[in-house]
UniProtKB/Swiss-Prot annotation:
GO terms for biological process: removal of superoxide radicals. Residues 2-137 form the Globin domain. It comes from Makaira nigricans. One of its GO terms (cellular component) is sarcoplasm. This is Myoglobin. It is an enzyme of class 1 (oxidoreductase). InterPro entries: Globin (IPR000971), Globin-like_sf (IPR009050), Myoglobin (IPR002335).
Length: 147
């Protein structure tokens, strides 16, 4: 619970501009881990130089961060939020669990740079994301998805 609170203390700047922060997260994810861009068919042909100004990347990044905000505010009571998300990511999008770990690292970097998330906050975010990812993975296993 304390980890969720610590991350939420720094969530305000992210929440104030989901589109900008979401674009930063996805652009960095695609730049640092180019293989992840292939998991998003609608972004597959976008050149690195064009990502920062791409409205679709901003919109999807905003969706990702809004969902993370819901999960943070649930403070661990997130089964009802995770189940449908895990279902769509396993059955429709086929997103391997490793990619949640990659985007978590990127979110930590962006929050450090743009929202002042310090070392203790980064550790708290890592703890929170480890819990969330474990719960997503448990749902994946129930669905028989080994991605």
């Amino acid at each position: 619970m304390a980890d969720f609170e610590m991350v939420l203390k720094h969530w305000g700047p992210v929440e104030a501009d989901y589109a900008t922060h979401g674009n930063l997260v996805l652009t960095r994810l695609f730049t640092e881990h180019p293989e992840t861009q292939k998991l998003f068919p609608k972004f597959a042909g976008i050149a690195k130089a064009d990502m920062a100004g791409n409205a679709a990347i901003s919109a999807h990044g905003a969706t990702v961060l809004k969902k993370l905000g819901e999960l943070l505010k649930a403070k661990g009571s997130h089964a009802a939020i995770i189940k449908p998300m895990a279902n769509s990511h396993a059955t429709k999008h086929k997103i391997p669990i490793k990619n949640f770990e990659l985007i978590s690292e990127v979110i930590g970097k962006v929050m450090h740079e743009k929202a002042g998330l310090d070392a203790a906050g980064q550790k708290a975010l890592k703890n929170v994301m480890t819990t969330i990812i474990a719960d997503i993975e448990a749902n994946y296993k129930e669905l028989g998805f080994t991605g």
